[in-house]
C-alpha cells in the first residue's frame, strides 16, 4: 500500500497510544520495524508479545482522509439520482476485506476525476433498502449513474483500469 503525503493526510505516531503496543500480528497500518513476527513460531510470538519487557517499535502512521463521501438512504436521491454530474457509488460493508481494497481505488479515482465524477460510499448494512432496490447481493459492488439512471455495474474487486474504462464509457455516453 502506497501512502501518500498529500495535504489531506493526518500523520501520528502510534506509539503515543497505549493500544498500539498490544498488536498481536503485523499489519500494513502498523509496520513492525524491529523484527518480523511471521518468522517466529506461534509459541515464540506468544511469549514475546506477553513479555512486558518487550516493546514493539512501530513506525509512524499516516492516514489520509477519504475523498469519496458517504451517502445514505436520506441523501441518496439528492446526491445520486438528481445529480447533474455522473456518480460512482461503492456499496460496501464494514466487515468486508475486499471492500477496503476497493475503497483505496475509489479514493484515487475520486481525486483523479474531481469535478467530472462524484464518488460516494454506501454502507449496505446500514442502508439496506437502497442496496435491495439495486439488488446488491454481495459486496463490493460499484454502480455508475448518469442523469439518475444506472449505467454500469462492477461486482467484486477489480484493477483500477477496469473501473476507469467503465467510468470513461459513462462519461462519453
UniProtKB/Swiss-Prot annotation:
Protein name: Thioredoxin M3, chloroplastic
Chief localisation class: plastid
Active-site residues, as the UniProt record annotates them: 96, 99
One Pfam family matching this protein: Thioredoxin
SUPFAM superfamilies assigned to the protein according to its UniProt record, in alphabetical order: Thioredoxin-like (SSF52833)
Protein's gene: GAT1
Database matches in InterPro entries: Thioredoxin-like_sf, Thioredoxin_CS, Thioredoxin_domain
Ranges of residues in domain Thioredoxin: 68-173
Family named by the database record: Belongs to the thioredoxin family. Plant M-type subfamily.
Effect of a null allele: Seedling lethality when homozygous. Increased callose deposition and accumulation of reactive oxygen species in roots.
Intracellular or extracellular location(s): Plastid, Chloroplast stroma
